[in-house]
């Protein structure tokens, strides 16, 4: 919630547009089993102060008339929003440069210098940077940084594949997800023993319409190593599943596909903060598919930790130290 609050004024603060919008969102529910899961999720979200509720399938169709009769109910939040991830990244980088930051692109980190049991530098393909603080923010590649100092970072790359349609007139007013997609996110074991080919591949539904009219249609969650290709097998299952919810999409043209790797942490929570294992090392990784959503608050927490040695929120439950036995 705090990250969403930051996004509302982020374009003004950074001096560059991040294209943040807040249209609200629906998580579509097909079965009684899914409904029971989402009722528990919504109850927990309400305890955290989130404005979210379970609505009927008919009410969901009033919001999005193209939805099929397969939808029994939905979880609805008027506060769901999104930003352009590329524009947001570039806006942060531009502002950082204005404030004196230096970026070394196409530069490989080759090691961490440790002296007297603490971080004293970062070794790169362009030379060494002397520093008493190093932030591990390498996403799915964070385990390779951990190995440099003997730490086992329990993160695996989790691929997601997305399709982009031809531009269409404004069709969808809300962001759309499905309950199965949420369940697979937190319980990847659900996909293992299933006879459903789509479920085996971690296929769910996510639909978002861009300001240019293109639909971003996905998605799936699969452990495929560091392979960033797309596959016909997965995209076919995504199409089969998505058209159960929005039948007219079977007649829409796909113009391109892409994939990305999410940093999946073994216990489902990100790793944020310092560690007793190595003073000077700070983690900001393992956000899985929530990286862009949680980027502003994560950056603020890490910045406070570096400057003040503490954060305004208790982040101890996100510490790497929870994995030290």
Model-assigned labels for residue ranges:
Residues 75-133:
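Helical element adjacent to the flavin cofactor pocket in flavoenzyme catalytic cores
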Residues 56-57, 105-107, 256:
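Short loop/edge segments at beta-strand edges and connector loops
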Residues 54, 59, 101, 271, ...:
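C-terminal lid/capping helical subdomain adjacent to the catalytic/cofactor pocket in oxidative enzymes
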Residues 27-37, 76-94, 104, 229-234, ...:
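Short beta-strand to alpha-helix junction loop
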Residues 1-63:
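Dinucleotide-binding Rossmann-like beta1-alpha1 core, especially the glycine-rich loop
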Residues 16-20, 113, 118, 128-129, ...:
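Active-site substrate-recognition segment that forms the wall
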């Amino acid at each position: 919630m705090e990250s969403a609050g930051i996004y509302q004024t982020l374009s003004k603060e950074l001096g560059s547009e991040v294209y943040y919008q807040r249209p609200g969102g629906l998580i579509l529910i097909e079965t009684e089993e899914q409904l029971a899961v989402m009722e528990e999720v919504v109850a927990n979200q309400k305890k955290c102060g989130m404005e979210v509720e379970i609505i009927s399938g008919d009410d969901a169709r009033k919001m999005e008339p193209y939805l099929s009769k397969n939808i029994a109910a939905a979880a609805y939040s008027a506060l769901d929003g999104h930003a352009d991830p590329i524009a947001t990244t570039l806006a942060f980088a531009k502002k950082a440069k204005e404030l004196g930051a230096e970026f070394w692109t196409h530069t490989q980190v080759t090691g961490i210098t440790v002296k007297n049991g603490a971080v004293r530098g970062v070794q790169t393909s362009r030379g060494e940077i002397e520093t008493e603080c190093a932030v591990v923010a390498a996403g799915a590649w964070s385990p390779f940084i951990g190995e440099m100092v003997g730490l086992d970072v329990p993160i695996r790359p989790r691929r997601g594949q997305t399709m982009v349609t031809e531009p269409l007139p404004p069709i969808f007013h809300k962001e759309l997800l499905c309950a199965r997609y949420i369940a697979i996110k937190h319980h990847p074991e659900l996909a293992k023993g299933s006879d459903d080919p789509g479920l085996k591949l971690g296929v769910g539904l996510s639909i978002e319409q861009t300001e240019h009219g293109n639909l971003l249609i996905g998605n799936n969650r699969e452990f495929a190593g560091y392979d960033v290709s797309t596959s016909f097998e997965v995209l076919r299952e995504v199409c089969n599943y998505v058209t159960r919810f929005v039948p007219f999409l079977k007649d829409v043209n796909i113009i391109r596909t892409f994939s990305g790797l999410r940093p999946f942490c073994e216990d489902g929570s990100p790793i944020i903060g310092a560690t007793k294992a190595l003073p000077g090392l700070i983690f900001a990784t393992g956000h899985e598919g929530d990286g862009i959503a949680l980027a502003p608050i994560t950056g603020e927490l890490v910045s406070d930790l570096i400057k003040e040695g503490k954060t305004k929120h208790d982040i101890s439950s996100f510490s790497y130290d929870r994995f030290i036995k």
